[in-house]
Amino acid sequence: MSRNLFLSITNFIRNLESLFLPHGGHPPALALAGFQHDHSPKSSQEFSLKQLIGDGLLWAVPKHRRSVEKRLKRKFGYPEYNWKPLREKRNLRSCLQCGHDHEMGVLCPFCYQKVLKETELMQSKIQETLGLDPVDKEVIVLYEGEKAEQSTDDLKNKRIVEMKKPRPMWFTKNLLQKSTQQLSETKEVKPSDLA
């Protein structure tokens, strides 16, 4: 309030001075002899955009300064949403099989790549032997030094693909078993099967 009042009074005084003193202010209090003081108003120059803009620095100055809280939020972010400084990860675990580090709840990327390469080799071998025809029978993959454990009658309805390399230690036979069981036709439950 007081600042606005002070500014309005100073503006009023300036306007009065410009009315009564048209030469741009108070007359000189001390004048040296022999020097002539010219009070003529400056000649009006043509308006140019280059003079108005100048080097353009003042045109990009912000009007209001940001508060300390906003500056710190812009610098560091919000802890609950997006925290910009680096933080240590506390959810890293080392794989029990290969020893590489990975995040908790995520498969080990190194082990996953091993399985992916082996699966691609199996798929390419199946594609070489069986072609691109639709598979109407179950496919059995046998590695070097393995024999089919099923009888010949069961093998008639299945296709066999042989890999010319030994089975990797981590790739056990139960990985090729189906994970879903077929529905049983009998609905009777024997007392020995309850527990």
Curated annotation (Swiss-Prot):
InterPro entries: Mitoribosomal_protein_bL32 (IPR051991), Ribosomal_zn-bd (IPR011332)
Main localisation: mitochondrion
UniProt name for this protein: Large ribosomal subunit protein bL32m
Function: Component of the mitochondrial large ribosomal subunit (mt-LSU). The mitochondrial ribosome (mitoribosome) is a large ribonucleoprotein complex responsible for the synthesis of proteins inside mitochondria.
Location of this chain's protein in the cell: Mitochondrion
Record carries keyword Membrane: no
GO annotation (BP), single: mitochondrial translation
Keywords assigned by UniProt, alphabetized: Metal-binding, Mitochondrion, Ribonucleoprotein, Ribosomal protein, Transit peptide, Zinc
PANTHER family cross-referenced by the UniProt entry: 39S RIBOSOMAL PROTEIN L32, MITOCHONDRIAL, LARGE RIBOSOMAL SUBUNIT PROTEIN BL32M
One of the record's GO molecular function terms: structural constituent of ribosome
